[in-house]
From Swiss-Prot:
Family, similarity comment: Belongs to the class-II pyridoxal-phosphate-dependent aminotransferase family. Histidinol-phosphate aminotransferase subfamily.
Source species taxonomy: Bacteria, Pseudomonadati, Thermodesulfobacteriota, Desulfobulbia, Desulfobulbales
Annotated source species: Desulfotalea psychrophila (strain LSv54 / DSM 12343)
Cofactor: pyridoxal 5'-phosphate
A GO molecular-function descriptor: pyridoxal phosphate binding
Name of the gene: hisC
Pfam family for this entry, one: Aminotran_1_2
HAMAP family for this protein: HisC_aminotrans_2
Keyword Cell membrane on entry: no
Enzyme's top EC category: transferase
GO biological process: L-histidine biosynthetic process
Keyword Amino-acid biosynthesis found: yes
Protein name, entry field: Histidinol-phosphate aminotransferase
């Protein structure tokens, strides 16, 4: 009898909450598009990455650290944590690092959600909030956006004694909308003490300063009765998506709890070195923000000229009402070597989401969009 019998199927007892989860749909990679469609020189404006690359200082620092890869990383990420504390104006004990800020989301759910716990999220927003809760066996309470903004009053009305976490991405992904600081302060002051409010600020770097709430100072001064968490990432403005490094700012008591569910060495050595260097590369950071603002302004004007309506955004991406089937437009754009995001899966069947690119990418996108709109008779 052969040692292995290929035709015997595994009989797995998969928990229902796991069986019902749909894997996260990442943006289509460039090499996959070029393999499937037989094209070259394609561009990707779908995943809100930094089109100007990574910080040169980060690249240099990583190159100089390649000889130390046989060593485990510093499990405390001391120097990166120290730099973040100085940057954010909080104590080192009020910071936790993650393999991307999404890992900090996972820490929070692992630490505070049980079978009967409830977590409030908005729809649409980052899909992983709900997935982590579902894996843990908690209950998702999903509140639809109101006029493409978080519906704070309905969220408040949904809070009960079982509510443990509230996730609010500010600015919101995929709409790019934000919450006025005064509204957010009132919301925080209305929350009970048993709730932790998680403000996902992945795109906060791109916001106008007068529209930004200084969440780190709220955390430092223990404002409100509820726990407050700010999630940040090096994936967007700092251009380090491939390194997977983010962090959370929160009260020391919450950090202590999250360390209990954190894997050792969760942020690798190169990510620590690269993020530390990127944090100090102010020139690259400021140039990224400037170029993003310039590109956003140009695209908004040109897209309106095509007869479409772009949606105002405080991020590095924006929505466009294409006045037709977004999935069809997405497919047609692929044939022209341009990857964008259809928003039909988010409940917006006539919208696409586009990342601001370089000047060359923006012009190529606009030409492809113009051609596709005409070919599909959308305008």
């Amino acid at each position: 009898m052969p040692l292995f019998q290929k035709e015997i199927a595994l009989k797995l007892d998969i928990p229902e909450n796991i069986e019902n989860i749909k894997p996260y749909p990442p943006g289509k990679p460039l090499d996959e598009l070029e393999r499937e469609y037989g094209i070259t020189d394609s561009i990707k404006l779908a995943s809100n990455e930094n089109p100007w690359g990574a910080s040169p200082k980060a690249i240099k620092a990583i190159g100089e650290s390649l000889g130390d890869m046989q060593r485990y990383p510093d499990g405390s990420a001391y120097y990166l944590t120290e730099a973040i504390a100085k940057y954010a104006g909080v104590g080192m004990s009020e910071i936790i690092l993650g393999n991307g800020s999404n890992e900090v989301i996972e820490f929070l759910v692992k630490a505070f959600v049980q079978d009967d716990s409830e977590v409030i999220t908005s729809h649409p927003s980052f899909l992983m909030y709900q997935k982590f809760v579902q894996v843990r066996g908690g209950v998702n309470r999903v509140i639809p956006l109101k006029d493409m903004h978080h519906d704070l009053q309905t969220i408040l009305d949904t809070v009960n004694e079982k509510t443990r976490l509230i996730f609010i991405d500010n600015p919101n992904n995929p709409t790019g909308t934000y919450l006025e600081p005064e509204l957010l302060i009132d919301f925080i002051n209305s929350l009970p003490e048993h709730v932790i409010l998680v403000l996902d600020e992945a795109y906060v770097d791109f916001m106008d300063l007068d529209k930004w709430l200084d969440v780190p100072s709220l955390i430092k001064n223990q404002a409100g009765r509820c726990g407050i968490v700010s999630l940040r990432t090096f994936s967007k403005a700092y251009g380090l998506s491939g390194l997977r490094v983010g962090f959370g700012l929160m009260a020391e008591e919450i950090v202590t709890c999250l360390h209990k569910v954190r894997q050792p060495f969760n942020v690798n050595s190169l990510a620590q070195v690269g993020a530390l260097a990127a944090l100090g590369d102010v020139d690259f950071y400021e140039q990224t923000l400037l170029k993003n603002r310039q590109g956003m302004k140009w695209l908004m004007k040109e897209i309106k000229g095509l007869g479409c309506e772009p949606f105002a955004s405080q991020t590095n991406f924006f929505l466009i009402d294409v006045q037709g089937n977004a999935d069809k437009l997405y497919t047609e754009m692929l044939y022209k070597g341009v990857i964008i995001r259809s928003m039909s899966a988010y409940g917006y069947p006539h919208y696409i989401r586009v990342t601001v690119g370089t000047t060359v990418e923006n012009k190529r996108f606009l030409k492809a969009l113009s051609d596709c709109l005409k070919e599909l008779n959308y305008v």
